[in-house]
């Protein structure tokens, strides 16, 4: 029986028609003289009715079917009796009286219920992913993914972009994370790398005159995993010639507005606010600030320059900072709750956490006796503290204070229920430093990647004051999650060689890793820039999920394995010999 309709295409306008349906048995209910079956296909559910008065043979076969059997049915669409309508179903006003049924495939009892809101170990869900994806919420996530990617393609096509695929097997040029390496059988002892991004190829496409490129690209990074990371992931990759930062930012805002409206029915306001990197780090403790709530961190370093409180004075004398966070309405916190925040601060690198409880007629704190009245007054004024508030302090090197205060801010936002979960709050973070100093390796590293252009006015201080150079970079952040990052690129060979030199790369190493790119820059390279978005992260936020694994068809676990296929796995000795490889025992 070849189906004539999907389940949810059936409505009151088709009542009286003969229909043929295919799908899975969702539930089966035997009411004595009648058997009711909810038939599920990708579109949804329709109720089937088996009656011996309609077709006795079909009724007896329905007695034998079970959940997840795949069946084909033929019958007549009817209105449900008024008292039995189901307002929770799109097809809740109709049902099909079955005249013929065929079992296309029986099914074993599933290891978990095929329904939403199940409490099942995620590894079990991943082992039986083909069953997990039958659940409505997982199906809906994949349908949302399809709509979002289609919106991306349609939008960029309408703006003159062309989709070009770049190589999966390429040269190893590590961009921060470790590469996944693929041994070559044809060239023994040599390896391809799976791309961490199409960065170099898309820039070469600009040299080739493609002008507007995009790709829904698969990327691979051998790094430690967490809820929003996978070893293989998808990104929307874009690059344009003859543009500046403003052109890219405006285009992306228009695209995001269209994606959210067409794919999810959500209206977002543009233009998005912009926040300089330094301000984000000072006021929110993160370059991925969540702006759905306040609790801004304030700078106290200048006003406390002459403080006698040793903890603050020591931090300032060693080139550090003192900052404070006014936890509004947290003055009722117990000492145990405050100590828990202090422990969290220490876990994240702080030496401790000073605090002041602001009460109606007094201040409770172990540090007020070390502060002058003027300092206390300035602290209260700068933080806007009132009775019932709790002031938390961070005093250390700027990067440590930013990290710790940012984590405390998020914890307090969650604890006090300040985060508007349904709100979509976009922000551009701009004016990044081009470089950051690695204390362990005693050299500068690229904040984003080594192809990001410095501000033109900063090129002259690249050698003398590299830490002060600002990048022509921009990140798009949504609700505290980085959606994507981009920049205007270096497009001249001498500037790119200068960047490699500042990063401590010798001319020989630069030629070995990037010689093909440097040579391409000698044949007329247009100014260009672009951006890349994590499709999985975007979908995680759109779908309201806590992990990218819920919006990917076949993700890996947090140990980078696949319970269903048992990848990664060993390979045969013959395969290793063909690749000139030998496994060394640990």
Swiss-Prot record:
Which biological processes are named by the entry's GO terms? aspartyl-tRNA aminoacylation
Organism's domain of life? Answer: Bacteria
The EC category is: ligase
Molecular-function GO term, any one: nucleic acid binding
Q: Where does ATP bind?
A: 221-223, 230, 482, 534-537
The portions of this protein that span the membrane are none
Q: Which reaction does it catalyse?
A: tRNA(Asx) + L-aspartate + ATP = L-aspartyl-tRNA(Asx) + AMP + diphosphate
Annotated Gene Ontology cellular components are: cytoplasm
Question: Gene3D superfamilies per the record?
Answer: Bira Bifunctional Protein, Domain 2 (3.30.930.10), GAD-like domain (3.30.1360.30), Nucleic acid-binding proteins (2.40.50.140)
Residues involved in L-aspartate binding:
175, 221, 448, 489
Q: Which residues does the annotated region (Aspartate) include?
A: 199-202
User: NCBIfam families under this entry?
Assistant: aspS_bact (TIGR00459), PRK00476.1 (NF001750)
Protein name stated in the entry: Aspartate--tRNA(Asp/Asn) ligase
Q: Which organism is it from?
A: Syntrophomonas wolfei subsp. wolfei (strain DSM 2245B / Goettingen)
